[in-house]
Regions:
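Bacterial N-terminal signal peptides
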Residues: 8-20
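N-terminal secretory signal peptides that target proteins for export/translocation
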Residues: 1-3
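Exported/periplasmic ABC-transporter solute-binding proteins
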Residues: 25-73, 81-85, 89-252
């Protein structure tokens, strides 16, 4: 009887040691396509997510329209963080996105910005906007100019960026004195980083609601699914809020 108990104990200890030594499930890797306006917050979110989960994220930034085209042509992305709601809806309709895995992660704000603290109300020669066919913030800029009845008046002085990041660069470099950009590009930690700006009234253009979408390639990717859950959480929202983003009401 004693030998039998001893044998059971030894077997139990051996199994326990195997359990302790068993390697943890390997971390996964996800590729995230990110609209250019969200590049700043994403730089903050990636290390927070990776530290919390052990997963790894690879990020590609571009205009919503350009990323949409890449995804439709088979680019290997698992998650799409768009600058609008229309583009993710088109991907879902085309069967590229996963039904039930899409939500509005933030609402952006359009601002008129100058690198010169004195120039928002001063003289200017060039006005930069993002390509309205590719960038939701460019579309909002055109809607704003239309609301003011200024499209024809300023048309000859417009310079157009491929995306909102290039639009900001036009203004920051002095190639344009003013530009319609995303608030998130010129605000960090609740403060304007440089220059001067004017927040465009929300009612002057369609709301810039921004949807996240799980793509078919990421359906069974634990890192992709975990990142979308992380994006809904309080920690991620705190980061986004510091860049000027707003959020839809609960249940909307």
């Amino acid at each position: 009887m004693r030998r039998r108990l001893q044998h059971v104990l030894i077997c139990g200890l051996w199994l326990a040691m195997l359990a302790v030594r068993a390697p943890a499930m390997p971390a996964a890797e996800a590729r995230i396509a990110v609209a250019a306006n969200f590049a700043g917050p994403m730089q903050r979110l990636v290390p927070l997510f990776e530290s919390a989960t052990g997963h790894r994220l690879l990020v590609a930034v571009g205009s919503t329209g350009a990323l949409h085209a890449q995804i439709r042509h088979g680019a290997p992305f698992d998650v799409f963080l768009a600058g609008d709601t229309t583009t993710p809806a088109m991907l879902r309709a085309a069967g590229v996105g996963v039904e039930g895995y899409s939500f509005t992660y933030a609402t952006g704000r359009l601002v008129l910005w100058s690198g010169d603290p004195r120039l928002v109300d001063g003289e200017w020669r060039r006005l930069a906007i993002a390509n309205p066919a590719l960038a939701p913030y460019g579309k909002a800029a055109i809607e704003t100019l239309g609301h003011l009845g200024l499209i024809e008046q300023v048309r000859s002085r417009l310079v157009q960026g491929e995306n909102i990041a290039q639009t900001l660069q036009f203004v920051a470099s002095g190639n344009a004195q003013l530009g319609f950009v995303a608030l998130s590009q010129v605000m960090q930690d609740g403060r304007m980083t440089a220059g001067s700006m004017w927040r465009v009234p929300r009612e002057w253009h369609a709301a810039i609601a921004q949807d996240a979408l799980l793509l078919q390639r990421g359906r069974d990717n634990p890192a992709a699914v975990a990142f979308l859950e992380f994006l809904r959480g309080a920690r991620a929202r705190e980061v986004m809020q510091r860049f000027g983003y707003e959020f839809p009401a609960e249940g909307s």
